[in-house]
Amino acid sequence: MTTKQVTCRYFLHGVCREGNHCQFSHDPSSSKPSTICKFYQRGTCAYGERCRYDHVKLSSRGGGAFDMAGVGGARDGASTRGAAKKTFVHQERENMFRAPAESFGADVMAPAPHTYVDAIRTGLSSSSQDHTPPTMAGVNQDLPRLCPYAAVGHCYYEENCIYLHGDKCEVCGLQVLDPHNPEQRSMHEKMCLLAFEADMEKAFAVQLSQEKVCSICMEVVVQKMNPSDRRFGILSSCCHVFCLACIRKWRCTRNFSNKIIKSCPECRVASEFVIPSVYWEENQEDKVHLIELFKSGVGKKPCKYFDQGRGSCPFGGKCLYLHALPDGSRAEPEQPRKQLGSEGNIRFMNSVRLWDFIEEREQHSAPPLQAFADDISELRELFVQMSGPSPDEGESQSRSAP
């Protein structure tokens, strides 16, 4: 088959630049149709009468005969299409809803070839292969059963829509329930109920957090000026309300012992860690669930002190962060060493340094500066009282005597 038997598609649209030197046929009446709109055969051509391809309907008997329709569909009307040199106009997305119901569909128009080589390949392949239309049974299986527009709100075609409009769900209010598929109905209702319960729990948590005041800064947590500060710092062993910034500042201070800073500022109950949360949790079960989520999330982050085995974590096996080696394997928790102090107390330590002993000895041997100053002032007063009155005081007392 030569290229002269294939109609030049660029000539049909009036954009052929080769003119008489074109290798394709510029006579629509003598050439064979080179393009058949496969989307029109499925009933899903979104371009309607503005389609550049031939609209060929399937015969009523389902055989090999064709019924030509649409723009340039008949061979007799091909010359009219070529003489008119109709230009292709792309249909806007919002105008697709105004197309007739028979041309509505979800498939997208196939792009036209950009080069002459693509045109040759497309024309030869479409003319040489057998024009056997696809069976409608296979096409109906590919089409969605439920109308996608009715499922998300409103369908423009309503009763004239070629798709099935499902039953309305009582929870979400959308037409997404298939009347012929009980399994799909039960699955959707189950998912809707789970989503509804999650939304209700979130609404209760928001309402519970509206009037919670931080016990340190005395401000309503959810009404702070900086949006990043509108988070609660929930203590693992306490139910007092603190904002995350205040409780972290309290636990990071170095002016007190570790036992004091880990305790609640109000009830003095020690908590191992602080849980950041957008909502306040008072129920103990919800709090335990929040703690488990916090531990699982933190356990995936690498520990900055361990540093993949290059450093030493002061928390040892109690650390909530991930202790992993460079190859990804988890490291065994370090066994902290025990040290017995001079006062009989036992402390755990991972590393022993000489400076720790020197610093501890100085803290125990040297008295506090304030206490030392108080002792000096008391000794001075005692010495003055024991030494008797001064000469000036004695002279003043003698003058005042009668």
Swiss-Prot record:
Metabolic or biological pathway: Protein modification; protein ubiquitination
Gene Ontology cellular-component terms listed: cytoplasm; nucleus
Pfam families: zf-CCCH, zf-CCCH_2, zf-CCCH_3
PROSITE patterns reported for this sequence: ZF_C3H1 (PS50103), ZF_RING_1 (PS00518), ZF_RING_2 (PS50089)
Record's subcellular location: Cytoplasm; Nucleus
Enzyme Commission code: 2.3.2.27
Zinc finger (C3H1-type): 2-29, 31-58, 141-168, 297-326
Gene Ontology molecular function terms on file: ubiquitin protein ligase activity; zinc ion binding
Any one of the GO BP annotations: cell differentiation
ZnF RING-type span: 214-268
Catalytic activity from the UniProt record: S-ubiquitinyl-[E2 ubiquitin-conjugating enzyme]-L-cysteine + [acceptor protein]-L-lysine = [E2 ubiquitin-conjugating enzyme]-L-cysteine + N(6)-ubiquitinyl-[acceptor protein]-L-lysine
Keywords in alphabetical order: Cytoplasm, Developmental protein, Differentiation, Metal-binding, Neurogenesis, Nucleus, Repeat, Transcription, Transcription regulation, Transferase, Ubl conjugation pathway, Zinc, Zinc-finger
PANTHER family, sorted: E3 UBIQUITIN-PROTEIN LIGASE MAKORIN-2, MAKORIN-RELATED
Function: E3 ubiquitin ligase catalyzing the covalent attachment of ubiquitin moieties onto substrate proteins. Inhibits neurogenesis and axis formation during embryonic development by modulating the phosphatidylinositol 3-kinase (PI3K) pathway. Acts downstream of PI3K and akt1 to up-regulate gsk3b mRNA expression.
Name of the featured protein: E3 ubiquitin-protein ligase makorin-2
Organism: Takifugu rubripes
Gene: mkrn2
